A protein has these predicted regions:
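C-terminal substrate-recognition regions of SAM-dependent nucleic acid methyltransferases
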Residues: 8, 229-394, 436, 444-445, ...
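Short, solvent-exposed loop/turn segments at the edges of secondary structure
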Residues: 76, 224-228, 415-417
Length: 495
């Protein structure tokens, strides 16, 4: 990534690739030895030439090793190596870099087959490439400018809050010939994002996935925090099986984990990556119809926590104690709602002078540019309001091991924010639920979800916790709870 240019990175997704990653990707793809001679290869988002520099160097060296004369090597560079990038500064630097490398082999005045334009509108390479490699741009759809309409023409990128790199996967697949290989490093989010569903369905249908290498928490790029995956596909690969690896960031090499099938890792419309045994376990948790012993929900979403919650909030008729689940700390909270979750009218909510003064002094922070109205003191969202008057169990949403969990009982009349909470649907001792969560098994389960966060942490959502607790209580305990819910009697929409 270009230093000091975060806005540009956000808009066009430039994150330049370190050489050791380039070398690994080319090795995974099989762009090695003299077999690369007279093989078409393209980087369709080449930037300043991180991939093309190594490609040119390998092509020259292997051609020399095979006894190819310089004039023929020059023609090969012009004919078989291709690149595209729409950033003129990076593009010009790429040309300079390639000229410098070629010159070191005694080759000059090359007419490179490089294009300074948008890859998404180019069709002349479709069906012609032996290799498509690269590090495509990562740009969320709401940051796209003129390329938005081009992106939406790609089926991989027309669902949900999409990302530009999904379109580049489809673009790359289109470029491959009948035996071509594609190898990209991209965010790992395509395995579990709603936006990438069409791509996952394509992989299930085509069975062209050769290997996935998960970099996990390892950060391959300078000045850019992203959790990445190296994906290798081949048009010549027609198998349900693929190899799964994890990348060792210290050794800069990958370690084989297991050969698994696409069907084994495709669970509830998402891809999960692990060995066969743990994928079977995860599949059971995610798909077996457990009894609904508990419900798990998100805490308050005031959208102005500093106004409603804090140690300086005045005591009043609408003040309750509220737990910040992410830290385990308690604060006062202004809760202008009745026991049915309905907003209190101004004459009640603002009856305490200290509360009225507090709200009025922070009115702009609550309204956030919206027009003023009498009940301006309401929360941004209504979630968790009704459950204030129930006993709950609070849980944070970040962990590395089970020791990072913060689990606390929250009594009826108290609130929760910045985390999740668990409600019993039948009488279950607090300790039983805690024991389910503080086990190493739960922490490992969360790690399998691969929702990476900085610092080596993983995160999880309400559905993840609810499925796990209900699965364990249904299938992995001998205890019988009163009023045990019957799966057959429950509304199956809950599952």
């Amino acid at each position: 990534m270009k230093a000091g240019n975060k806005t540009k990175t956000k808009k066009i997704g430039q994150v330049f690739t370190p050489q050791y990653i380039v070398e690994e990707i080319l090795n995974y793809a099989g762009y090695t030895s003299t077999t690369i001679i007279d093989k078409h290869i393209i980087d369709n988002s080449c930037g300043d030439g991180a991939f093309l520099k190594v490609i040119v160097s390998r092509y020259c060296q292997e051609s020399i090793n095979s006894g190819t004369p310089i004039n023929k090597i020059k023609k090969g560079l012009e004919k078989y190596i291709h690149g595209i990038d729409n950033d003129p500064v990076a593009f010009n630097q790429c040309v300079e870099n390639l000229n410098e490398i070629a010159c070191s082999y005694g080759i000059t005045n090359i007419k490179w087959d490089l294009y300074n334009q948008s890859s998404l509108s180019m069709k002349q390479f479709d069906g012609k490439m032996d290799f498509v490699v690269g590090n495509p741009p990562y740009v969320r759809v709401h940051n796209l400018d003129s390329t938005y309409e081009e992106v939406k023409q790609y089926s991989f990128a027309n669902g949900g809050m999409t990302d530009l790199f999904l379109a580049f996967f489809e673009l790359g697949f289109n470029m491959l010939n009948s035996t071509g290989k594609l190898c990209y490093i991209t965010p790992s989010s395509w395995i579990n994002s709603v936006a990438a569903l069409n791509m996952r369905k394509y992989i299930l249908r085509e069975k062209n996935l050769v290997s996935l290498t998960d970099l996990g928490h390892f950060q391959a790029f300078d000045n850019a925090t992203t959790y990445t995956l190296i994906s290798l596909f081949s048009k010549n690969h027609k198998s349900n099986e693929f190899d799964f690896y994890v990348f060792d960031g210290q050794k800069h090499e990958r370690a084989f984990i297991d050969r698994i099938t696409v069907n084994e890792c495709y669970i509830d419309s998402y891809f999960y990556l692990s060995d066969k045994a743990h994928l079977k376990w995860l599949n059971d948790i995610k798909t077996k119809k457990s009894a609904k012993y508990v419900s798990v929900k998100n805490g308050f979403a005031t959208l102005a926590d500093d106004v409603f919650i804090g140690s300086d909030i005045p005591e009043s008729n609408i003040t309750i104690k509220t737990l910040k689940a992410s830290t385990g700390k308690w604060y006062n909270c202004l809760f202008p709602y009745d026991k049915k979750g309905k907003l209190l009218p101004p004459e009640i909510a603002l009856s305490d002078p200290a509360v009225k003064t507090h709200f009025e002094s922070h009115k702009e922070d609550i309204l956030k540019g919206k027009p003023d109205y009498p009940c301006y003191y309401e929360y941004g969202r209504t979630q968790a309001l009704l459950d204030v008057w129930k006993d709950k169990i609070a849980i944070n949403t970040l962990l590395r091991t089970e020791k990072d969990l913060k689990i606390e009982r929250v009594k009826a009349g108290q609130g929760i924010y910045s985390g999740l909470y668990i409600i019993n649907n039948v009488e279950i001792p607090f300790e039983d639920i805690v024991n389910v969560l503080v086990s190493p098994d739960f922490a490992y389960y969360v790690s399998l979800l691969k929702k990476y966060k900085s610092g080596g942490y993983y995160t999880f959502n309400t559905k993840d916790v609810e499925q796990y607790i209900n699965y364990v209580l249904t299938f992995k305990t001998d205890k019988n709870y009163d009023d045990k819910p019957s799966i057959s009697d429950k509304d199956l929409r809950l599952f």
